[in-house]
Swiss-Prot record:
This is Superoxide dismutase [Fe]. It comes from Plasmodium falciparum (isolate 3D7). Keywords: Cytoplasm, Iron, Metal-binding, Oxidoreductase. GO terms for cellular component: cytosol. Its cofactor is Fe cation.
Amino acid sequence: MVITLPKLKYALNALSPHISEETLNFHYNKHHAGYVNKLNTLIKDTPFAEKSLLDIVKESSGAIFNNAAQIWNHTFYWDSMGPDCGGEPHGEIKEKIQEDFGSFNNFKEQFSNILCGHFGSGWGWLALNNNNKLVILQTHDAGNPIKDNTGIPILTCDIWEHAYYIDYRNDRASYVKAWWNLVNWNFANENLKKAMQK
């Protein structure tokens, strides 16, 4: 099974001015595509060549895991954002955030602090844990909650420097602030609904 680069659901300029077309082009067509190409090279003629991307993420380690997880994480990241998104949450995710964090503002502040305070490259996640509570998680490098079995991902934000350096240089806080204007709450609601049924 050849792993392919998932198609973006919006144009490369659709997230501007918060994330520029230049950033999205490099991030998607160079970084994300690079992980796909590298993974296909690594798994050729191995048992992983017949497995799905998700199974590779769960079962692999080392370079194969790093590339597989980065493919999965980036696809989830693109879907966590969208044009004409952002603002306050709605529907079940709004109610669940209020239940587990007290208010959306509390959640937003806590999540932003995790994203800005994370040392080095990684990811920030909103996930549903085994106790059906929303939690904020941070993973290093290619890590994700699926591999760590720490929760079911609901949303993610990429905090590798390549996600923001063209637009914001070393100012991660400004990137995080801009990211809130792109959060796809419909995607979060879909993920929460599926997670609650498991």
